């Protein structure tokens, strides 16, 4: 109630910082009495919000009703079939493969607890539910897809929670819940290039993953031999205003191993293969890389790297920004991953996938079917 009153005050519907008291008695021409208009508006908003929150949402059950609805006609991130043959218009062409979705099929989700970051309308949470997850938590910075997410729950008969997290930092504290516990699988895809500090986001997520759990990390990358992050100065990489950094492939590989995440599989699409109205191609060779990682108990340094382990032992940032005590106390999970990758793509010293070497062999040029794309259909099971 306090929050609703605050909203009314912010909208200028309540006077003097408080709900307006009705004047003593204002006679009308009919001898009746009325209250002040701002007070009436405030109370109407409060009552409407209370009814909305106490009453389950209803959605069109016929194609005719749905086709005429604001729900169907509104802006959608994903293309979603809500009723047979009625698919919302998403932001991506059907040829654009959704790499983390494809990789998720190799994970045995039965009985698992899953976390999805930046869920939008909830395509990945629905897929996780349909693959047998016991519990799924969807998240986003703001609650901007509440109605559409509720629609997916309704039409797909999916049961998952949602939590608004604000800026994607300090997630271990924001999402820690004794009743829910930690996660067997975490999907953090399409996020790291949207934040000021990709390492801070991963540092906040790492304590939420069970020992031996799986994390899918997907982000835009620069393809070269450097260990760098390239800044989106003047929109040179993308014109989108919340895009800041592209990690180099080698930098991403290193950061994951530094945070005790072993790359075990990956898929890649070059930005040159993406047919979209959004400009992805620049004079920098770049693309979108999705990596499946297995949580380990120690940093994974290459044979010649003496710095990584020293840094992990003595760095204040490493010790202070990642709750390693929580990581070490996590239960051990045994989520199977069914895909195998060619041995020549593995580093001989770490046993992990060499991401730069793997790009050419693990490239997808386009989606072969809608279930590989940013499209969700009622018949999809993954």
Model-assigned labels for residue ranges:
Residues 91-110:
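Conserved alpha-helix/loop element of class I SAM-dependent methyltransferases that forms part
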Residues 112-120, 217-236:
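Conserved class I S-adenosyl-L-methionine
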Residues 122-126:
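Glycine-rich SAM-binding Motif I of class I
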Residues 127, 131-169:
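Class I SAM-dependent methyltransferase SAM/SAH-binding core
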Residues 187:
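A conserved beta-strand element that flanks and buttresses the S-adenosyl-L-methionine
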Residues 199-214:
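A short glycine-rich, Lys/Arg-flanked "PGG" loop and its adjoining helix->strand segment in the class I
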Residues 235-250:
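Acceptor-substrate binding/catalytic loop of class I
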